[in-house]
A protein has these predicted regions:
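Membrane-embedded alpha-helical bundles of multi-pass enzymes
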Residues: 1-53, 88, 95, 253
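A broad, low-specificity signal for short, low-complexity segments enriched in glycine/proline
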Residues: 24-30, 66-68, 178-182, 203-205
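Beta-strand-turn-beta hairpins that frame and shape the catalytic cleft
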Residues: 54-68, 207-218
């Protein structure tokens, strides 16, 4: 991620200098040559990597995956009056496009706009979906942990087995600053008055692969996808599939998600 960001910025700087110094190309020739060499090396390495990945894919065991995107408007998502409608939408879409046999169905981050861990009719509906399709179901849900000092909230991903039981859970460990927590809040209590609307989530315990049969699944939640070290850690721990579940509905009809 960081290296690619550098290359994008560097190439744009070279193009800018070519325009500014178009009457004196010799002045920007060194950086132009450097840019061309970097792009050539990246292209060559990319081709080599793609060929290696194709070879590994041909040898790997396949799993059918269905990605379900409900496109629930953020303005109504957390309204209790629309919870049943949201889950019914995900249920219908999942049943329509399910792998039907030990595949994987993936819903987005916070797809269940309630605490799935609490026994309820809607939680039972969600648990019943993998039973109907005989597939695994991965989805995001808010969660909480009652401790002596109070209740801690997490941004979590749950994995349900084909029998509808919770096979694993991952709590987001790399939280969004000023979105899911406020840095230094413990040391500067007065910040609470300035950012009352900001979430204060509990950080998860770090990289934790979820087991699907004989395979390990690496789960990343939204913002965690920009940190390559997280994906690398999953790979080093044996994960054969990485899944990033995200809710970009916060951005509404803007260019931000793109």
């Amino acid at each position: 991620i960081y290296g690619l960001s550098f290359v994008i910025v560097f190439v744009n700087v070279v193009l800018f200098d070519l325009i500014v110094y178009r009457e004196n190309i010799k002045k920007v020739f060194p950086e132009l040559a450097t840019g061309c060499i970097i792009l050539a090396l990246l292209f060559g390495y990319g081709q080599f990597s793609l060929n290696r990945i194709r070879h590994e894919l041909n040898r790997s065991e396949a799993m059918e995956v269905s990605l379900v995107q409900g496109n629930i408007d953020q303005n109504i998502k957390w309204n209790p009056d629309y919870q049943r409608e949201s889950i019914e939408l995900y249920q219908n879409m999942s049943l329509k496009k399910a792998p039907l046999g030990l595949g994987l169905i993936v819903w987005p981050e916070t797809a269940t706009p309630f605490f799935f861990q609490d026994p309820s009719h809607l939680s039972a509906v969600v648990r019943n979906i993998p039973k109907l399709t005989s597939d695994w179901l991965l989805f995001g849900s808010p969660s909480y942990l009652d401790e002596g000092s109070g209740t801690e909230y997490m941004n979590s991903a749950f994995l349900l087995s084909p029998d509808g039981n919770v096979a694993g859970r991952y709590d987001k460990s790399h939280l969004v600053p000023y979105g899911e927590y406020v840095p230094l809040r413990r040391f500067f209590p007065f910040i609470n008055k300035l950012v009352a609307g900001i979430g204060d989530f509990k950080r998860g315990d770090g990289v934790k692969a979820l087991r699907i049969g004989r395979h390990d699944l690496g789960v990343l939640i939204c913002y965690e996808g920009i940190f390559p070290e997280i994906s690398r850690k999953y790979k080093e721990n044996g994960a054969g599939l990485l899944v990033n579940i995200t809710n970009d509905a916060w951005f509404g009809r803007t260019s931000a998600p793109y």
